[in-house]
A protein has these predicted regions:
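Glycine-centered, phosphate/nucleic-acid-interacting loop/turn motifs that mediate DNA/RNA or nucleotide
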Residues: 60
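Long, low-complexity, charge-rich intrinsically disordered regions
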Residues: 1-3, 7, 77-99
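Short, cationic-aromatic polyanion-contact patches
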Residues: 11-15, 34, 65-88
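Short helix-capping/hinge SLiMs at alpha-helix to coil transitions
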Residues: 24-30
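A short alpha-helical element within helix-turn-helix/winged-helix DNA-binding domains
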Residues: 32-42
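Pre-recognition alpha-helix immediately N-terminal to the DNA-recognition helix
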Residues: 17-24
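Key DNA-contact positions within bacterial/archaeal DNA-binding proteins
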Residues: 47
Length: 99
């Protein structure tokens, strides 16, 4: 993924993947994802997903309705979003101990 191209769009590669996931999930399931759906797909912790949602909202890339579950909406055209990388092709974070 080209970091420079994504930054011109106003989001990082990681943010782009979350935006692509929200868009794709909504198309496939007919409703926006819950944070739990993003936790499972990206294999990250609840605080990680929550912080990403807050940062996407603060950047004006998504909107949410306070107190309404599954109300995330992507505010960009599909053509501005990157292709979603399949779950199995995503790198898994591990901790490496150096000796």
């Amino acid at each position: 993924m080209n970091r420079a191209a994504d930054s011109r769009q106003g989001f990082t590669p990681k943010q782009g993947q979350y935006l692509a996931f929200i868009h794709t999930y909504t198309l496939v399931n007919g409703r926006p994802p819950a944070e739990a759906d993003m936790i499972r797909f990206f294999r990250v912790t609840p605080p990680t997903v929550h912080q990403m949602v807050l940062s996407l909202e603060k950047a004006g890339l998504i909107s949410r309705k306070p107190g309404v579950p599954r109300s995330i909406a992507v505010l960009l055209e599909r053509s501005a979003l990157p292709e979603l990388i399949p779950r199995d092709a995503q790198p898994v974070k591990t901790t490496v101990t150096r000796y």
